[in-house]
Amino acid sequence: QTIYQYVNSHLDEHGRFTATNLCDDRYATIPRPLGSEDAFHYTMGNLPNPKSASVLLKLLQAYLNEPTTQQRSKLYNELKGMAFAEYCDPFIEALDQNDINSVAFDLARRFFYNADGREQVKFALLLFGMYGMEKICQQEPELWQDLLRIAHCEEFTFAFLYSCRVTNFNPQNAIWELIRCTSGWGKVFSITDCHCRDEEERLWLL
C-alpha cells in the first residue's frame, strides 16, 4: 500500500487523520508522534545538512539527464534514511528552478502517488513547491486537492506548508482547513502561517 492510499483510507468525515502511525512504520514498538522528526530539526535550531542536500541534488540531476528506472531507484533509496527538515533549505538554495521541467514534475507525481515511504512523498512535495504550488492550485485542481489532503496527516503538514512558501504562496483557505483538522505539530506549523488579527488570536488557536 502506498503512503497516499494509506493516508486517504485513514481520514474521517471531518478530514482528520485517525491512525497514529504510517504504513512504513507500522511495526515500531514506540511510534513517533507524526511530524515530530521534522519539527525537532526545524525548531531546535539544528544546522541544515548541506551534504545530504548535495547528494540528493546530484541524484536528481542524474535522473533528469537520464530518466531511467535505475537512476530513479537510486534517488528513491537515498531518501529512505533522510529527514526532510535537514536538507530542504540547502536543497532549494542549490537547485535551479529551471531544472523543474516536465521530467521533474512527472517524477514528483510518481513519488507522491506511488511511494511506500514518507520521505519520498515529502521530496515530491518539495519538487512541486519548486514547480510552483500556486500554479498547481490554479492549473491542476485535482492534484492540488490531493496535496492538501495528504497534509491532513501531520507527518506531511510541514512539508506541504514549506513547499508553498518556496514561491511565497500563502493559501489561507488551505491553511485554515489544516488548522481545523490537526492537533499536534501540523496545527503548530499551520498556525504559524495563518493570518491572525494579532498574537493573542494566534495563541488562542494553539
What residue ranges belong to the model's regions?
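Alpha-solenoid HEAT/Armadillo-like helical repeat scaffolds in large eukaryotic proteins
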Residues: 107-115, 143-153, 163, 174-182, ...
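Generic helix N-cap/helix-start motif at coil->alpha-helix transitions
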Residues: 83-87, 115-123, 140, 151-159, ...
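Alpha-helix initiation and N-capping motif
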Residues: 101-105, 172, 198
